[in-house]
UniProtKB/Swiss-Prot annotation:
Any one GO biological process: fucose metabolic process
Keyword Transmembrane among UniProt keywords: yes
Pfam families, alphabetized: MFS_1 (PF07690)
SUPFAM superfamilies: MFS general substrate transporter
One term of GO molecular function: fucose:proton symporter activity
Function: Mediates the uptake of L-fucose across the boundary membrane with the concomitant transport of protons into the cell (symport system).
NCBIfam families on file: fucP (TIGR00885)
Family membership noted in the UniProt record: Belongs to the major facilitator superfamily. FHS transporter (TC 2.A.1.7) family.
Organism: Haemophilus influenzae (strain ATCC 51907 / DSM 11121 / KW20 / Rd)
Subcellular location: Cell inner membrane
Transmembrane segments: 10-30, 51-71, 78-98, 100-120, 147-167, 204-224, 250-270, 288-308, 311-331, 339-359, 371-391, 401-421
GO cellular component, one term: plasma membrane
Protein known as: L-fucose-proton symporter
Highest taxon in the source lineage: Bacteria
Amino acid sequence: MNAKVLEKKFIVPFVLITSLFALWGFANDITNPMVAVFQTVMEIPASEAALVQLAFYGGYGTMAIPAALFASRYSYKAGILLGLALYAIGAFLFWPAAQYEIFNFFLVSLYILTFGLAFLETTANPYILAMGDPQTATRRLNFAQSFNPLGSITGMFVASQLVLTNLESDKRDAAGNLIFHTLSEAEKMSIRTHDLAEIRDPYIALGFVVVAVFIIIGLKKMPAVKIEEAGQISFKTAVSRLAQKAKYREGVIAQAFYVGVQIMCWTFIVQYAERLGFTKAEGQNFNIIAMAIFISSRFISTALMKYLKAEFMLMLFAIGGFLSILGVIFIDGVWGLYCLILTSGFMPLMFPTIYGIALYGLKEESTLGAAGLVMAIVGGALMPPLQGMIIDQGEVMGLPAVNFSFILPLICFVVIAIYGFRAWKILK
């Protein structure tokens, strides 16, 4: 008899925890296009603007292990509530950041916001895995993760329709060139104040939504799911055991490269489109199309897992991503942009599948193992500034630098494909 993906007693808690996946998806994807916005309005190079992503995902690296230790000592619910509190604080800090018009203040706000996201991901992912039979854990997490892109596409839509379309700094002349850099300092200051307020407002609204979710989960009685390692093994012992498990160890590496490819493809699609003459808002609309493909592929790939091994599908989809990125690099013009959009169709199963493969069979070390996989996110955050540095070159090896910069996602897909193959055929 096949094990159920989700038992009836877990439905309401599952729905509440799954809503968190949409919340961090929203934060991720309203933030991605802000790299291009800060680059223009603060008049900084792409490499410096990409520090937005380093700050955003750096919070994961800082807080993943503390979040795991906190959840182990108290409970998954306590970890989730603390995560929501930090999330709200970071969002509300956008108000003073916009008032003072300091780029580094925005970075600090994002850094604190992602302290909260680290708590949420470190606790919500293993909580979902624990809500039922271990045999269906990866399918259950893939299903829960299916709602993450719903938050993502909402964040993209808000960025496109409520922020990017209202930016004074993105006004162009008849030839399609930005005019912001040609204005007087007084005009720039006025526009900067206006545009930073446009950036600020969605984050403030988001803060209030997070507070509401905090109250709902705080008042709801959640099922007690045992956290195996609490009080049983030391931190050092858990780390030692994890380091000896090749499937886990290599999974952390693969996860870092997956996060890198996701951030780079969804952040720099705007710059790729701008080089072709599109506005930031139009570039973000292409990102929304990519996310729609991502969502559709998520549900399709989750259904296919009933018939195909997760490890095999991971390898297959990584090869597809590799081929589409080749088009991004070597096909100039709008067809290269279409290849970049298509790449999103190969990405949706990767994060939860790597997560499920790496954690499968772990017991006492499961929460700390989850923290290690969340920490891997910061590894991916190191890649966007490097891609920004390539873009700043203008041209590399006869190719537009923005095209050539996608050699980094190309390498990422190679690493993921190798992990999928090894997990399928070699690692036990």
